[in-house]
A protein has these predicted regions:
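N-terminal strand-loop element at the rim of the active site
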Residues: 1-24, 28, 108, 193-195
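Nucleotide-activated donor-binding/catalytic signature segment of Leloir-type glycosyltransferases, i.e.
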Residues: 12-14, 200-204
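Short His-centered aromatic/hydrophobic patch
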Residues: 48-54, 73
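A conserved, positively charged/aromatic
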Residues: 9, 63-66, 70-104, 113-118
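A short helix/loop element that forms part of the nucleotide-sugar donor recognition site in Leloir-type
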Residues: 33, 135-150
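A conserved mid-protein helix/loop that constitutes part of the nucleotide-sugar donor-binding site
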Residues: 154, 158-183, 187, 194-200
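An amphipathic, basic-hydrophobic alpha-helix
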Residues: 14, 19-45, 55-59, 63, ...
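Carbohydrate-associated surface elements
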Residues: 107, 128
Length: 204
C-alpha cells in the first residue's frame, strides 16, 4: 500500500501493482508491462520516479509500446550500497529508454541525463507545494505546543521522508549535542520511509 492510495482512488484513479524493480524480476516486469498495455489500451504515458531503477519501468514500457515515457530525476547522486554498481549502469541507460526528461532541478537533470540532452530537451518541474497551508499561524503554534506539552520548550522540527538522502542520522547526532547545551529542547521528526524504524531506535 502507498501513502496516497486512498486519495488516488477518491479522485477516480486506479492503481496497478506490478513486480518489484530489480534485475532478478526484470523478465517478469517486461511481461507485466506488455500485459498491462494490451489490457488497458487507453494508457499512453508512463511517468517514472524511481531513481536509477526507473530504467526497468521505462525500458519495459518501451518494449511494450508505450508512446510517451517520462524519466523524472530528483537527486544529484546515488546513495552508496551494494546495489550502487547496478544503479550506475541503469542510470546510464535511462536516456535511451525515455522519450521525455523531467527534473526537479537543473543539477539533477544533468546528473541523470547529461548536460547536452538536458539543455536540449530537459523540462524543469518544480516540486509543487501549497505554501499557504504551511504558513506561520500563532494560534496553531499555541495549540500544538499545548497538545504536546511543549509550551516552554525549545523545539526543533523536520518534515522529511526517512531515507538516506535526508540524513536523519546526522540530524539526531547534532540534536544530541544541542540537548547537552539546552536540556529542555525537543526534536520532532515528521515523515515515513524505509529508515523510520532504524531512526526511532537510534533516537532512544
Amino acid at each position: 500500500p502507498g501513502f496516497f492510495d486512498d486519495e488516488v482512488r477518491s479522485l477516480g484513479g486506479r492503481i496497478f501493482m506490478g513486480p518489484g524493480l530489480s534485475p532478478l524480476k526484470y523478465p517478469e516486469y517486461l511481461r507485466y508491462m506488455k500485459t498491462l498495455l494490451d489490457r488497458e489500451k487507453e494508457i499512453k504515458v508512463l511517468h517514472a520516479h524511481n531513481e536509477a531503477m526507473e530504467f526497468y519501468a521505462l525500458n519495459g514500457a518501451k518494449k511494450a509500446g508505450f508512446p510517451v515515457r517520462i524519466a523524472h530525476a530528483h537527486n544529484t547522486h546515488l546513495p552508496r550500497g551494494l546495489k550502487l554498481p547496478v544503479k550506475l549502469v541503469c542510470k546510464e541507460m535511462i536516456p535511451g529508454a525515455a522519450t521525455d526528461y523531467f527534473a526537479c532541478g537543473r543539477e539533477a537533470g544533468i546528473y541523470y541525463f547529461g548536460e547536452k540532452r538536458w539543455n536540449e530537451s530537459g523540462v524543469l518541474i518544480h516540486n509543487a507545494i501549497d505554501l499557504e497551508r504551511f504558513g506561520y499561524r500563532s494560534e496553531v503554534r499555541t495549540r500544538l505546543r499545548r497538545e504536546y506539552q511543549l509550551e516552554d520548550k525549545l523545539v526543533v522540527g523536520s518534515v522529511a521522508r526517512f531515507m538516506v538522502q535526508k540524513n536523519h542520522t546526522r540530524m539526531l547526532e547534532q540534536f544530541a549535542c544541542l540537548k547537552k547545551i539546552y536540556p529542555n529542547s525537543h526534536l520532532l521528526l515528521a515523515g515515513e520511509g524505509e529508515l523510520q524504524a532504524a531512526m526511532e531506535e537510534k533516537a532512544k
